[in-house]
Structure formats: C-alpha cells, structure tokens
C-alpha cells in the first residue's frame, strides 16, 4: 500500500521522522472497525465481541499506540490479520499467513481459522509455500508446480502423493565451488564480531532491549529467537549500523568500539544481510543481476560499474540459488520467493565475514528452503565466517548452529 511505497530500510529506527500525524496501530484498526460497521446486517455488539476477541488473540492492545513504522515484521503481520478479519469478509484469501509469526501466534491463528471454517462463515483460500503449514481443516489442495496448475485433489490425496525431499539439494560440485572461493578480506583478523555491554533500547515508553550482554566470537554460528516484538530485528539493526541509538550504547563491532571514528561502511563491508524489512524496502524494478551486484558496495541501486571478476561472482551466486536465466528479469516481475533468493545472493556476493539472516526462508518452497540451509552450512565451513540467523521455525535452522540467544519481550 501507500505505506510500503514510502518505506525505506532504516525508517523503523529513525524516531525523528515520527510525529503526531504518523499512523498508529489504533488508528488503522479503528478504520477497519468503521468499515465493518457499514456491512449490511452486521450487529454492533457482534462486531465489538469480534474485535475484543481478535485483540486478545493477537495481543493487540499493547500495540494500539505504537506507530506502524515501528512494528516488527511479525507485529505488522498480526496487524494485517486483525484488520482483515475485523472487516468480516465473505471470501478470505491469505498469502502465507503463518510466516513471520512466533509459534504461539501461529497456533492461535490455526485455531481461529479452524473455527471460522467450521462455522462456514466465509470461503477460505490459503496460499502456502510450506506443506507443513497446511492446517488440518483444509479440504482441498491445488498445487502450482513450475507455473503449472495441477488438478484439485483432497488434502488426504495430496499428502499421500507427496514426494519426500532428497537429503541433499545442493550439488557436490557447487558445494566445492563455495568452499574454494577466494577470500575477499585477507587482512580480516577480528577476534570478536560483536560485543554488547548492558545495552538498553527504548522507543517512547516501551523498552525493547534491557541490559543486554552478548558476545559473538569470530567463527561462531548463532540462532536468535524470541516472540514477535522481543527486539530481534532491533538487535540486528545495532550490529548492522542501521540504528542511530547504537552510538549511545556500549557496542564493539569487529574489535572497533562504536563512535571511535569508524564509518558505517567500515562495518558494513564485513556484513551480508537479509531481512523482511530489506525485502519490503526494495521497490525498484531493476534487473536481478544489478540488485545482486549492489551488494558488493552495500547500496540499494548500482552506482559503480563492477569489474568482470565481480560480475562473475554475481552470476555465480545467482546460479547457486537457482536463479540462472533470471539475470535480466526485473525485481518486481519476480515472484516473492524469487525476490528473496535474489536478496540472499546479494548478501553472499561480497564474501562477508558476518552473514546476518533475519527470517531468510520467508515464502520459499520446500526445495528452496532446503537449498538455502545447505548453502549456509557450506559457506560457514570456511575460515572466519560468522552467522547470526533469526527464524520462528526450529526446523529451519541449519545444522551448523552452535550458539543460541533467546530474547524476552518487555511489555
């Protein structure tokens, strides 16, 4: 919508852009409530009861005064779900409604949709990329495979004929090519990738992070978890030098204390990064190959012509992620899954010492999720490669994970 068109990557962390006219969760939901009141034959008491239930279901009351641009990706999805269900639609089409939600919220949503389906209140169509996300109340499945629409079958028929995923999707040849890549920053010798001492972050009256101590050693592979709104993306924004509050915190990155003369580019040159916010911020319809190449210089667009060697690296990573043949296809003409794979290729292309993957498997099908996990496992086998990965699905974590930090929400 209009919010997405004016959104940029660091906007969530820049509070100086928030004023009394900035839309909040409460104003957005009030608009949905007012629209629902115009529905013919709808009783106000019934609507009020539905609103109260949705607010309880998705824990929306604590978010009502929060500006929409400050929402985490999971909180934003909960807002959109509440808004949509509040308008009492007769036909509901939901595109991957479970991604970005923590385990408790996913289960609550399954229960809610199951009750709606059982009552026959509306026609429900779910677009899902993960077979495991299909709720048991679904009656029929239509599979789209390589742009071919398969015949409609019952859920039982679909599950009975599913082919098991092979143990390995990444070819041995490609894995060896990744392991044998030349190192970009031969002078890199940081002992610690990140050290945070008693870090606290507040937005208005709400505490996001409180007295957090965290050390990420060189070569470690971390899983970062927590409920929606627990501060995972905020923490990553401090490490990626996207959050202005980092200068007021005791943070050392790559053995360099923040605010001691280093530029954000000194930090970013070592980091490859993918997140839901980054995906949302990419609205430029430029060829996929150019987007991958922009990762070489940490820019949104491509402003410096890459060398032949750099372009070869871009094509290599596009091929790794199954994007060969899509180099000239512009970003907005790709599917959301293909877009995510392009952004992953962009994150890996400069051979970063730290790879930060915030829910990188959003919208990917079963095969591509397996592929990405194998690419991650292979890449971090190399010397001086550190990983921080966020996901709400434990089975999405690659096997290389050897450390875990769980954040707690401070309401």
Where do the language-model regions lie?
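Catalytic Walker B motif of ABC-type/P-loop ATPase nucleotide-binding domains
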Residues: 92-96, 355-359
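Conserved ABC ATPase signature
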Residues: 43, 67-71, 303-306, 330-334, ...
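ABC ATPase nucleotide-binding domain signature region
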Residues: 1-38, 236-300
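Conserved beta-strand-loop-alpha-helix hinge in the C-terminal portion
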Residues: 146-174, 398-399, 403, 407-411
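Conserved ABC ATPase "signature" region
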Residues: 46-63, 293, 308-326
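Hydrophobic anchor residue at the start of the ABC signature
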Residues: 80-81, 344
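The feature captures the beta-strand-to-loop junction immediately N-terminal to the Walker
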Residues: 225-227
